[in-house]
Amino acid sequence: MRYIRLCIISLLATLPLAVHASPQPLEQIKLSESQLSGRVGMIEMDLASGRTLTAWRADERFPMMSTFKVVLCGAVLARVDAGDEQLERKIHYRQQDLVDYSPVSEKHLADGMTVGELCAAAITMSDNSAANLLLATVGGPAGLTAFLRQIGDNVTRLDRWETELNEALPGDARNTTTPASMAATLRKLLTSQRLSARSQRQLLQWMVDDRVAGPLIRSVLPAGWFIADKTGAGERGARGIVALLGPNNKAERIVVIYLRDTPASMAERNQQIAGIGAALIEHWQR
């Protein structure tokens, strides 16, 4: 009988390890920083209330990289709502307007693309020329920064065009945000009256349709979970993702993760972001 009790006690002692194979989110972030020899910035925010659930370096500046394209298309949709733009408007451009990594726009030199098609290309495929063409419609980097100030984001700033904005120089405040500011801005775009309900649905759908985020949080997403995201990559180890996540196919939380100043390879950076995502998912009910 005593032997049986000892076996049961031993079994119970192993259960927490079996239930939670991943570290707690903050533990995973600290581990990622150590393994990357760089900096990680992260915030997990409740979508409905705006309450911060987890944060690490949330008020430090990180390069936005291509995650700015979500905010850009939010600014475009705000112009649509105001009657100053139409998603169906066709924009024509030339070969000299194309920059590196333009997998969609480079195929439409002859016929051009609509504003809506450019937003879809910028978010779902991270098309850089599409982003520049859209930036021109909102007044360039300064115009997008002005839009951010209008909606109450006094931190995030865009100063350059694609692809120079991805330089990620140490100590350079240009083209940066903080995890907290990016999460708050994304929440405003998707839940407040800054955008119409129709435009909110459209912005979210473009993020749902993201086709270049596979190696990151999507790689560890359980069946039945919701995700809508936009990634970014830059020089000097910069990598990032802004995402909406939740079980039961429902967007419950905003997750923003940025990396910078790491010598790690792209595959290693992707793996670390996926690991942080896995820790968040495994410890969702905290």
Curated annotation (Swiss-Prot):
One Gene Ontology MF term: beta-lactamase activity
Family: Belongs to the class-A beta-lactamase family.
Disulfide partners: C73-C119
Protein name: Beta-lactamase SHV-8
Keywords, comma-separated and alphabetical: Antibiotic resistance, Disulfide bond, Hydrolase, Signal
Extra remark: The class A beta-lactamase family has a specific amino-acid numbering system, sometimes called Ambler or ABL numbering and often misspelt as Amber. A multiple sequence alignment was used to derive a consensus sequence and then the consensus was numbered taking into account insertions and deletions. This allows use of identical numbers, e.g. for active site residues, despite differences in protein length. UniProt always uses natural numbering of residues, hence there appear to be differences in numbering between this entry and some papers.
Gene3D superfamilies (UniProt xref): DD-peptidase/beta-lactamase superfamily
EC supergroup of this enzyme: hydrolase
Gene: bla
InterPro entries reported in the protein's UniProt record: Beta-lactam/transpept-like (IPR012338), Beta-lactam_cat (IPR045155), Beta-lactam_class-A (IPR000871), Beta-lactam_class-A_AS (IPR023650)
Reaction it catalyzes: a beta-lactam + H2O = a substituted beta-amino acid
Pfam families: Beta-lactamase2
Natural source organism: Escherichia coli
One of the GO biological process terms: response to antibiotic
